[in-house]
């Protein structure tokens, strides 16, 4: 007699399980996230591949005093791609599980294939694809140049077969492309379902820790920009990297939103070319290329991403509104922050912006959320409103408070040094930060207490 199947409902956001459908998840509070999955009644909770492996390993587990554990940061493996190493915190940690997410066509597979190319020069690397054939991967690899014989390909989606190959071949690095295509025979649901993604990730986690090899897994993203599948997926891995950018543009930005072995503030900048992804060593110069001359509403500001200062062009367009409700649009920065700064300008400087449309854009498509760009947004709006260009060789940074004061920001000396290196002659910054940058020569420093002082300069 065939075994029956029972229905369970999983939350797509957090992976919470319920016996019946609910409108709101009691675990994470999200609405309309439960999906139904059919499970064999013969497979009970706790009898999947990973849980059986866990019970077997418990018998052999040994406790070790913390004082006897040796940890050497030199054990990190450099990928040879400096922008990626920067985001990872200095290289790949052995035994780590890294999730790489991003929109389709953004370059996730290309980046990981380039990592495999670098590491296969002196390590045995296994690239497992569930989406492409070996011939398709070879066509993509031909654009990048020659590959070492240490790079091996496996086109498979069955979790049990993949686990057996990894344990047999013992590679020094594994890439899984992608986690949504993997499935286990022990889980009675379709590939890409909540239970399949969770089970597959758990198995790869055990392989990474047990064999002490780094495992990279590619994850698709939803329309909201988060990794598809249960939210618990991001909790299970050691590092979560997001590949951002417009696939119709050439630049790409790699961000770490979770990193157990490094900072989550660093970014890596790449440019997509015919031969693959090329590192952009000086993002500031890249972001400012093509800036218009003597244009009102344009100003250069400086933001810090991790330890790296990046100069960006902030553009604003303020014009009379023909509608009863003026339009406010922000691209690359927080929309509510723009509204707040415009309210400060109206209240503290008496600017009549209530009947004006306002459009604020961070040129190049990069997104900045640091408060240090507040003063740049204010200056760009005033410049456009009064139709007065700001000197091209001037850079600004500072946080703006509700009283109109310009507050200090961190690392002002690095910001000024970056501006000087790129040929800027004047820097408008918070007055309280002047004493920290007085040692830098060759650039004129103007300290301001409030936005009124800054606006007088233009």
Which residue ranges define each predicted feature?
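Peripheral, non-AAA+ core regions of ATP-driven protein-machinery
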Residues: 3-13, 17-86, 93-99, 106-116, ...
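P-loop (Walker A) phosphate-binding loop of NTP-binding proteins
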Residues: 103, 130
């Amino acid at each position: 007699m065939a075994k029956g199947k029972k229905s369970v409902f999983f939350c797509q956001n957090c992976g919470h399980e319920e016996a019946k459908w609910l409108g709101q998840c009691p675990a994470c509070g999200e609405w309309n996230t439960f999906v139904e999955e059919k499970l064999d009644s013969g497979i009970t909770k706790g009898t999947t591949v990973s849980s059986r492996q866990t019970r077997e390993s418990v018998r052999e587990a040994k406790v070790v005093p913390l004082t006897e554990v040796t940890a050497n940061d030199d054990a990190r493996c450099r990928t040879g791609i400096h922008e990626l190493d920067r985001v990872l915190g200095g290289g790949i940690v052995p035994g780590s599980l890294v999730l790489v997410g991003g929109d389709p066509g953004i370059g996730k597979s290309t980046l990981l294939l380039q990592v495999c190319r670098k590491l296969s020069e002196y390590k045995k690397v296994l690239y497992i694809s569930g989406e492409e054939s070996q011939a398709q991967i070879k066509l993509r690899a031909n654009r990048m140049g020659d590959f070492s014989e240490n790079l091996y390909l496996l086109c498979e989606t069955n979790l049990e077969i993949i686990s057996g190959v990894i344990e047999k071949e013992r590679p020094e690095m594994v890439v899984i492309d992608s986690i949504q295509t993997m499935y286990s025979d022990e889980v009675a649901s379709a590939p890409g379902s909540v239970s399949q993604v969770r089970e597959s990730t758990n198995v790869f986690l055990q392989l990474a820790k047990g064999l002490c090899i780094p495992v990279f897994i590619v994850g698709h993203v939803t329309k909201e920009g988060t990794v598809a599948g249960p939210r618990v997926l991001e909790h299970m891995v050691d590092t979560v990297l997001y590949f951002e950018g417009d696939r119709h543009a050439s630049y790409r930005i790699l961000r770490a939103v979770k990193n157990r072995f490094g900072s989550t503030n660093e970014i890596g900048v790449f440019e997509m070319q015919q031969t693959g992804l090329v590192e952009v060593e000086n993002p500031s110069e890249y972001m400012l290329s093509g800036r218009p001359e003597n244009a009102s509403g344009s100003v250069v500001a400086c933001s810090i991403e991790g330890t790296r200062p990046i100069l960006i062009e902030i553009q604003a367009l303020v014009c009379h509104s023909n509608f009863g409700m003026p339009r406010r649009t922000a691209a690359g920065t927080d929309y509510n922050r723009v509204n707040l700064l415009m309210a400060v300008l109206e209240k503290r400087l008496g600017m009549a912006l209530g009947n004006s449309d306002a459009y604020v854009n961070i040129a190049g498509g990069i997104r900045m959320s640091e408060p240090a760009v507040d003063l740049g947004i204010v200056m760009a709006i005033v410049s456009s409103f009064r139709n007065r260009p700001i000197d091209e060789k001037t850079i600004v940074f500072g946080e703006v408070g509700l009283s109109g004061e310009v507050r200090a920001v961190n690392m002002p000396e690095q910001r000024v040094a970056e501006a000087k290196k790129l040929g800027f002659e004047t820097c408008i910054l918070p007055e309280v930060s002047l004493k920290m940058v007085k040692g830098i020569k060759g650039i004129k420093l103007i300290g301001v207490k409030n936005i009124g002082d800054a606006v007088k300069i233009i």
